[in-house]
Amino acid sequence: MNMDVNAVRSSIRGKHWFNVLTQNFEAIDTGIASLHVANGQLDGMEISVLSIVADEHNLYPRARQGEVGLLEGWSLAFAVDQIIQADRELEKKRSIVCIVDVPSQAYGRREEVFGIHQALAGAVDSYARARLAGHPLVSLLVGKSMSGAFLAHGYQANRILALNDQGVMVHAMGKESAARVTLRTVDELESLAANIPPMAYDIESYNSLGLLSNLLNVSNADEPTDEDIEYIQQALKNAFEDITLSGVNDLKHRLDAENRSMSKRVRELLREQWT
């Protein structure tokens, strides 16, 4: 069971950023209230924007605060696959933006029985296929990007951007859960994280792992100004241009950061042994 279930609070950041970045876009019916999709243009570039949002009336109680659950996983998989199929014959594929503000995957007995692992894997598969098919894929982290929810929605992107704000964090589990699992207090966990970047919750520590392409400074992450919106739109445009110029659709660049040197070395040694 997720020991953070009762601690999760609904965030509206993802929904708000989705709304301001998709003004005058065409809203796409996804069949569920917790997945928003819109198609439009960014400086003449065709893009699709996807975001998971809170739905207090979600059929599954464990997925009412913006978590990625059974419905969200399969709906993401279908929505992204629709994009792939629509552009299959086009030489230039449309770009995809994932707006990420997800507190967790949905934990519950029903989720386990009905196979949430398959639902989330379906979303991962569709995003990976889109990237490999040539769709430039950029994730914008505006809030929590936690656990399997982030793996299902956002992690497969060619480039990951994040707001440089204390409300943005990436981790495998919440602090309270991590403290219980490691038999520490939250204060002890934070002290440990100060010297071990993968254990930390702040976005700057995550950035040191080489997984982010850019940290973006905005004046107000909760209520972005017109200047903030223009700045983020330009950052997205720059990221898409960088993807196109690189001509690469894999994720190997994530291993180039200093704190990933041993990860890179392990892969090199395994490759030597297996070939």
Regions found by a protein language model. Give the residues of each.
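Conserved catalytic cores of soluble enzyme domains
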Residues: 108-229
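STAS-typified acidic loop motif
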Residues: 43-74
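Glycine-rich anion/phosphate-binding loops
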Residues: 29-33, 66-82
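N-terminal short beta-loop-beta anion/metal-coordinating cradle
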Residues: 28-46
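A structural preference for short, pocket-lining loop segments at secondary-structure junctions
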Residues: 74-107
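Short acidic, glycine/proline-rich loop/turn micro-motifs
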Residues: 59-63, 107-112
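Amphipathic alpha-helical segments at domain termini/boundaries
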Residues: 1-28, 179, 183-275
